[in-house]
Design a protein with these regions (language model features):
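N-terminal secretory signal peptides that target proteins for export/translocation
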Residues: 1-16
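Bacterial N-terminal signal peptides
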Residues: 22-34
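Short pre-active-site segment immediately N-terminal to the catalytic Zn-binding motif
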Residues: 178-192
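Active-site His/Glu-centered metal-binding helix of metallohydrolases
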Residues: 194-203, 237, 241
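Post-HEXXH active-site segment of zinc metalloproteases
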Residues: 205-231
Length: 335
């Protein structure tokens, strides 16, 4: 009997593991492209999200362009408008005006004449914003509107220069710097500032509108890519109430002037060359940008772009926050 058979068998047995591993390697190498193909498939699955993100980016670019054009038109209209308000930085450069200066007297008379309608339109604008931002009716809110309705007095003040303010100890009075009175040359410009100050009166020492202020600050931060503190949110909300009140006033008092010119008067004092800020206020031009981003309808009234259907945004989330007690101090509309 040949002895080579067992040896042959052993040799075959030694080769089988190597052959098996070689086959596995071939199979893995053959399957590798199928794994590579998975990557495009995963990308294809994420393309709807990518398209949505691209759509949001495009919408943001369109809004930014609308706001930019609206700002340019507002400031161009101010330069051409005989009744255009002086920019804030120009007001600050002027010397103080005496109480009996003709322009001061004319401004005070304009403010007194517009105060009754300003109270109505400011209250309507506040109620609209409260609905949009999910601020519920409460005793504090009712007290806010009661305070607003009780304002009766316009008081010129040389020391306030280019500012307006309210004092907690005089809740029925709005004080105007004499330069400010002389520099707001149109009904629209004056009414916007009155509505701003009336919103401060409504808020009061107890901070009745703090939830609304916080909601506006958060939304403006998203709309205009800004970080807005609580106090700046308060001032921005007052400016927004002023702009909405002016829009309502224009709608109810048609005239021969263009819509763009009359709308620009609500913003014209922000058309500054020196765009400074402080702790309480956004800079004037940043304020204008935030307002137009918050209210694109206002921007379209300046540019003449077709109006889009207005939709109510989702209410801002409600959060509770303690408000620090404020001393009796002036409340100013802007810097």
């Amino acid at each position: 009997m040949r002895q080579s058979t067992p040896g042959n068998v052993k040799k075959v047995n030694r080769r089988r593991p190597g052959a098996w591993l070689w086959c596995v390697a071939l199979v893995c190498a053959w399957q590798l492209p199928s794994h590579v193909v998975v990557v495009p498939s995963a990308r294809a699955q994420s393309s709807p999200e990518a398209r949505r993100a691209g759509g949001r980016t495009e919408a943001r670019r369109e809004t930014d362009e609308l706001v930019r054009r609206a700002m340019n038109i507002a400031c161009m209209e101010r330069e051409l408008d005989p009744q255009g308000s002086a920019p804030i930085d120009e007001m600050q450069a002027r010397p103080s005006l005496p109480l009996r200066h003709a322009e001061v007297v004319a401004g005070a008379e304009r403010a007194e004449r517009l105060l009754p309608v300003a109270k109505i339109l400011a209250a309507e604008s506040l109620r609209r914003l409260m609905r949009e931002y999910g601020v519920r009716e409460s005793a504090a809110v009712r007290a806010a509107f009661a305070r607003l309705s009780q304002v009766r007095v316009i008081k010129p003040d040389m020391e306030l220069r280019d500012n307006a303010s309210v004092l907690y100890r005089e809740p029925r009075t709005i004080r105007f710097g004499t330069i400010f009175l002389a520099s707001l040359r149109s009904d629209e410009g004056m009414l916007g500032v009155l509505a701003h100050e009336l919103t401060h009166v409504a808020d009061g020492a107890s901070g009745s509108l703090k939830t609304l202020f916080r909601g506006v600050a958060e939304r403006a931060g998203r709309a205009a890519s800004l970080r807005i503190s609580a106090r700046r949110g308060e001032e921005l909300t007052c400016d927004l109430v002023g702009a909405l009140a002016v829009r309502a006033y224009i709608a109810r008092t048609p005239g021969v002037e263009t819509l763009a010119r009359r709308t620009a008067r609500a913003l014209a004092h922000n058309c500054v060359e020196h765009d400074h800020t402080d702790r309480a206020h956004l800079s004037p031009r940043t304020t204008m940008r935030a307002l137009l981003a918050l209210d694109p309808a206002l921007a379209r009234e300046l540019t003449g772009d077709p109006a889009e259907p207005e939709t109510s945004p989702a209410p801002a989330p409600r959060r509770t926050q303690r408000r620090a007690a404020h001393p009796i101090a002036p409340r100013t509309p802007r810097r």
